[in-house]
Structure formats: C-alpha cells, structure tokens
Amino acid sequence: MMHAVTRKDSIQKLTVLNTKSETPFIPYQGKIIRRITTNELGFSKTLQDTSSRIRYVGTRIVNVLHRNTRGWVIKNHLFFRENTVLNAYILADNERYLRSLDFIRDARIVVRRVGNTDSVDVEVVTKDLFTITGALKVKGVKGIGARGAEANFLGMGQRIQITTLLDRNRQPAFGYEFLYSKSSLGKSLATITVGYTVVNSGISTGMEEEKALYFRIFRPLVSPYSRLAGGLEISFNSSQNYFRKPEPDFYRYAYDLVDVWAGYNLGVTKLLQKGAIRDRSFLALRLLHNDFTHLPEQVAGNFDPVYNSKKAVLAEFTLFRQDFYKSNYIYGFGTTEDIPSGYNLAITTGWFKQLQLQRPYAGFNANHFVTSKRGELAQYFVRAGGFWNNGKMQDASLLVGGNMFSKLYLLNTLKLRANVRFSYTRTFNRITSEPLRINNPFGLRSFRADSAQGIQRISMYTESFVLTTYRVLGFQLAPFGFTDFSLLSPNQEKIYKQNLYSGFGGGVRTRNENLIFGTLELRFIYFPKTPETFRAFKIAFKSNLRFRYNSRYVKAPDIIQLNSDETLQY
C-alpha cells in the first residue's frame, strides 16, 4: 500500500502525493453537505498552489481564446448533492471521474468544516485543458487536409469537429467530416456523439476509404456505487473508390452496425449503506448486429474476420474491487494520475454467428492490479476463451501477461522510471478468427508489416524514460530508450526454435499538459530482422498519443481480443 498523508483539511496546498484517493475525505465521512461550489482555474494558476500566478505571453493568449468550463457543467458531472450525507469514497470516485473528462486537465474536491456543526461545504476545483486544436496534413503538391476542433465549445462540455480534404487524385477532390459530441447530457453522465464523414474517419472496419453516418451514446460505470452503465452505436458505412483503384483491387462493400449493451451493479443499494465495502458484482448484456449488405467479391462466401456479417448475444458477469491511488509521472508529465489497486474478473458467455456458422462462446478475463509502498505498479492478466462446435473447441485462445513500472527515482531535477511488459499468446483450432500478428501492442512497436503471422507468440518490451524540467514553449521533454522482442510460431513447433523479431532504439516524448491533444513522440528504431519490403531503420512520429492508466471498472461484453488491447499503451 502507498503511504497516506495527514491533513488539517481535505487538502492544504492541493499537492499530488502517492496516497489513497479517499484519504483526504475520511475525516468528513457522515457529515452533511451544506453547499457545493465550483472554482474553475484559468491557465495562470496551478492546482498545486492557487495563490501563485503563471505569467508569460502564451498564458495570456490562451486565457483570451479559452472559455472556462461553466460551473453548471461541472455540477452536471457530479454524483453527490447538497443536503445529503458525505461518502468519502463517492467523493474520491467523482474527483477521479472529473479528471477523465476530455476537457479537464486536473480536478480536486475540497471539503471544509462549517464551524462546530456537523455540516461541511464542498468546493470542486478544476483546471481546464486548452481545447482548441487543429491539424494540417500536406500530401505533396496535389493534396492538403485540415482539421479543426473545439472540445469544450462555449465551456459547455460539447465538442465540435470539422475536417476538410482537398486532393487532386481524389474524385470528388473535396471531402469533409462533421462531428458533434455532448458530455453528460441532461445530467445523465452519458456522452452522445453524432457524425458524418466521407474522409474515412468513421468506424472503418475494412481497408478501403469509407463513408459513414454514425450515432453513439455511452455511459460508464463512474463509481462502484453507481447503478447503471451501457452504450449504443448505430452506423451506416460503405467503401468508396475515391482514388479510382482498378476494380479487381478495390474491395466494394457496405455494412450496417447496431451494437447495444447495458449492465446493472448488483446489490448497490445495500452496499451504499456499508460504504467501506468495495467488492462489487456487475451483470451486463450485449446485442451485436454487424450486417454486410454488400460483400466484396474477393471474399464472397468465405470466412473472413473482417468482411463477414456477425451477430452476437453476450452476457458478462464481473466481480471487481478497485481502489485508487493518486500519483504522477507514470504516463503523464506531472498531472494527477489515478492508479488502480485490486482485481477484476469478467466471465463471458453467449451465442455468436458468423456467416452461417453458429456457436456458443465462453471466456474469462482476469486482472490483478498491484501497488507497493515503494511506488512500484503492476498489472497482471490472464485471458482465455473459445467456441464450442461439433463436440470440440474452435478458435480457442489463451493470453497471459503483465505490465510493470518501477518506482520513481529522483536524480537532482530528473525523474526516472522503468517499464517492462510481457505476454504469451496461444491459439487452438483456428477456424474464423484472425491469426496472431506482431504489429500491435502484443508485438513490436512501429512494426507495421502484417505478413508475420502465427498461432503462438511471446513478446517482451522494456523501456527506461527520464522526465526533465526543461520546457520549450510549455512542452516538457522526456527522452527514452527501449528494447522490443517477439517470437512468433506459425505451426506446432517449439516457439523457442522460431526466428526472433526485435527492435532497438530511443526517442523523445513531449507534451504541454495545458493542451488537449496528447503526447507527441519521436522514435528512432532499428529492426535487425525484417521482411524484404520493410526497411531496417525507421523514424516514427506519432501525435495525440493518449497515455493513461486504464481505470475502467467494466466494459461491454466481448470475446477475447488477441491483436489489440485498450489496457496496454501502444
């Protein structure tokens, strides 16, 4: 367990420490909340010391351009109310939830006593991200694309995004996208999104340019004391031959998607009366209908993991206990990060249809999150699943692995940390599922060739990074070095006899924590062994990387994914 802290009030100087999230609120457990106020900081103040001011030209400019989140918008994202009993765990969960919002950089909830009464006042202090973003992409002399977005338009928790494209090789030459999103619509804590695109920025199931009209709504389980979670996605998609590929090479297809799920936190009313108990159970049901109304001729009626119609009814029972610690300098550059500690076990069963093949499915996903007194962090996981057909298992899989961080080392003004990730994957009797590949989070970073495929995979990634105090225009620099290894077996032979794929190199990451777009990364890589068409040396630049420790309690029921993973950063 990480060390806790003792305070006279719920916070003194808003300092981020390695402490349990609920610790500042425990002294006020059971008090009556008299009043709730909000305090939206500008870019000239910090959460660590609200009395000091940051004064430079950039701060003045963004303060002029930016509209702070309105107080009523912040209150729409709260799940505690005035004239109710204070629950320390709910306040801690709410503070963490506020930090997860796209337009909030950091948040603190401050509790203050009201004289000698049994009442308290609660102040919600937030610091926004600068949410106006833009991007420009030049494609030689014949093409140019631009994207502009405001993720907190008018300070009302709504996102407006417009993308345009002009390319002489494209017919028509002009393309566009429009997206609108609203957070916690009607105090529901649900986010709605609607969009239309002709520039391949939708779901894009296939490999061609796609046109799409889509609608999404998502409500997370914001706290172990919350009752409901769920989501809905409806989209209409079709491939478009904008760049006039020859017909034999172009995959012409169209598909409609309806994906809905909902879940209920079992026994939450009883557990609310016993606030310290954090063990929970959650039951969810998902209905999936992905219908290809037009199939590409290249696939016809053959099994294909991408271009087949799919229907599924999946139920998932989740047992979990996740407490959180407030820490920093893990994935971020100093802003508060919420680190889970505990377990999460999800058991999934249901029915799945692909083309005319109908099969029952069963699987499980077990995760253990560990923190130590020294500040070390780890996530260990075991995932397995498969289909039953004709008296035997089909498309069965096993995936085990871990993701570990060392404690934070201080060397003068430098902060150093190491990260190790490893995984082992095995598939059995593959019929319709994708083969294992290494161009994903369970393989080699920036290795884009998809010709390396197999049924068994072992991977390990190690990285050491240094966080400096040096800034350029508000962007903090973090150099890193890494090694990457993968063994991939295409058959039943022993995996240690297979060819070793590896990558070595280093680079630098940078981020301005006041801006909404994510981390920028420049990576230099050497691959000793590559396919013939793949260069051994590579320079990779990525923008808008979202490095954040996974902290979701539950998700939509799903089959085990072997070539992608939202809980591992990539």
Enumerate the language-model features and the residues they cover.
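Immediate N-terminus of the mature polypeptide
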Residues: 1-391, 404-570
